[in-house]
Amino acid sequence: MSEQNNTEMAFQIQRIYTKDISFEAPNAPQVFQQDWQPEVKLDLDTASSQLAEDVYEVVLRVTVTASLGEETAFLCEVQQGGIFSVAGIEGTQLAHCLGAYCPNILFPYARECITSLVSRGTFPQLNLAPVNFDALFMNYLQQQAEGEVEGVEQRQDA
């Protein structure tokens, strides 16, 4: 009789927490006297690390910068962390889980922190649109593949 692989896929959220939080309004109070037509820039970054067997930490960093002309109205950064149990998932499925699925879970928490910080800074309400982490992850994979292809071509020319 042959032995079958009975590894079941399992996913569980162990904890979601705010790892780091920062809010700066470097040009207050002068910025409050200007017309509020900001340019808002959103930067996202994710990182993951293995804590134990089948246990991973995923950190989503969200940075929002609002500028009025050359002046920064506010800069807000939140690092939203999560600890996830992920069993029976390997390779590209694991990479997708940690690079897209987990950030999708963390983003609403980070968005709420940012909204609260901006409000406490007495700036107009900031509503961050949902982010398609699946598309961002696929774009990342495509860039990685193109980088590897370019690297191979360069090595062949050398």
From Swiss-Prot:
GO terms for biological process: protein folding; protein tetramerization; protein transport. It holds the Pfam family SecB. It is found in: Cytoplasm. The keyword Chaperone applies. Transmembrane segments: none annotated. InterPro entries: SecB, SecB-like_sf. GO terms for molecular function: unfolded protein binding. GO terms for cellular component: cytoplasm. NCBIfam families: PRK05751.1-1, PRK05751.1-4, secB. PANTHER family: PROTEIN-EXPORT PROTEIN SECB, PTHR36918. Homotetramer, a dimer of dimers. One homotetramer interacts with 1 SecA dimer. Belongs to the SecB family. One of the proteins required for the normal export of preproteins out of the cell cytoplasm. It is a molecular chaperone that binds to a subset of precursor proteins, maintaining them in a translocation-competent state. It also specifically binds to its receptor SecA. This is Protein-export protein SecB. It comes from Yersinia pestis.
